[in-house]
């Protein structure tokens, strides 16, 4: 049985383009069956993260808007 692990990237306090740049760097080191959990409070991330994932062929499997931040689970 395969288990899926999450790599958490907390970019709260960072503004565009830093959340996407940190995501891109994390993706370079991802292993099979790992997902990335990106936490951000950058208002532009609602557009930037899905756009980046779409361009690169990555899938956002979950997207939540919390009170003070957004959360994305990304499958690469």
Can you name each region flagged by the protein language model?
Residues 1-30:
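An N-terminal amphipathic alpha-helical segment
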Residues 10, 43-44, 72:
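Intrinsically disordered, low-complexity regions of eukaryotic proteins
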Residues 22-58:
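Amphipathic, hydrophobic secondary-structure cores in small proteins
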Residues 6, 35-37, 69-71:
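Intrinsic-disorder/low-complexity, polar/charged segments enriched in Ser/Thr/Lys/Arg/Asp/Glu/Gln
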Residues 10, 39, 63-64:
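Solvent-exposed beta-strand sheet faces enriched in polar/charged residues
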Residues 50-76:
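C-terminal structural segments of small proteins and small subunits
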């Amino acid at each position: 049985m395969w288990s899926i692990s999450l790599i958490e990237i907390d970019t709260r306090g960072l503004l565009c383009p830093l959340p996407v740049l940190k995501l891109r760097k994390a993706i370079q080191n991802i292993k099979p069956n790992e997902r990335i959990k990106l936490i951000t409070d950058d208002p532009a991330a609602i557009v930037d993260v899905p756009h980046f994932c779409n361009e690169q062929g990555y899938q956002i499997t979950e997207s939540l808007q919390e009170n003070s931040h957004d959360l994305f689970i990304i499958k690469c």
